[in-house]
Swiss-Prot record:
Species of origin: Arabidopsis thaliana
Compartment(s) where it occurs, according to its Swiss-Prot or TrEMBL record: Membrane
Protein's name according to its UniProt entry: Putative aluminum-activated malate transporter 11
Entry similarity comment: Belongs to the aromatic acid exporter (TC 2.A.85) family.
KW Membrane (keyword) present: yes
Cellular component terms per the entry's GO annotation: membrane
Membrane-traversing stretches: 48-68, 78-98
Pfam family membership, one: ALMT
One BP annotation, GO: monoatomic ion transmembrane transport
Length: 152
């Protein structure tokens, strides 16, 4: 079974022809991930180390959040505070482009906005849906954190 799908010449409206192009299957994309990670690690090992730190800390905080018996008396906004502290502390170890104060202001504003909307979302969606929505929010927050670390 071939991993590559070839598409032949396609005639366009103006008579121009598109040359063959290749569509990669997901297995090919997955095979390229280690090579990309290796090249990023060779260029700047701090980025890889920082990514592992962020991923590990957000995973631990997420696991603590799913053990709701620890947080019944505190409330759901406490977890957002913990995640903010984790993100802000890790900001000091990988500073590129923006200054630390600009990054902290941007990340705190985004997390504060989400914390303010949290009780309304919980009432609307219920506890089960809230737990399911927490993971994509964490991923989006990690991506936002990564974007904030990009130089201009």
């Amino acid at each position: 079974m071939s991993n590559k799908v070839h598409v032949g010449n396609i005639e366009m409206e103006e008579g121009l022809s598109k040359t063959k192009w290749m569509v990669l299957e997901p297995s090919e994309k997955i095979k390229k991930i280690p090579k990309r990670l290796w090249s990023v690690g060779k260029e700047d090992p701090r980025r890889v180390i920082h990514a592992f730190k962020v991923g590990h800390s957000l995973t631990l905080v997420s696991l603590l959040y799913f053990m709701e018996n620890l947080f019944k008396g505190i409330g759901s906004n406490a977890i957002w505070a913990v995640m903010t502290v984790v993100a802000v502390l890790l900001e000091f170890f990988a500073v590129e482009g923006l200054t630390i104060s600009e990054k902290v202001i941007l990340s705190m504003a985004a997390r504060g906005r989400e914390s303010a909307a949290e009780p309304h979302e919980r009432n609307e969606a219920g506890n089960v849906c809230h737990s399911i929505k927490f993971l994509p929010k964490s991923i989006a927050r990690a991506k936002q954190h990564h974007v904030l670390n990009q130089p201009y």
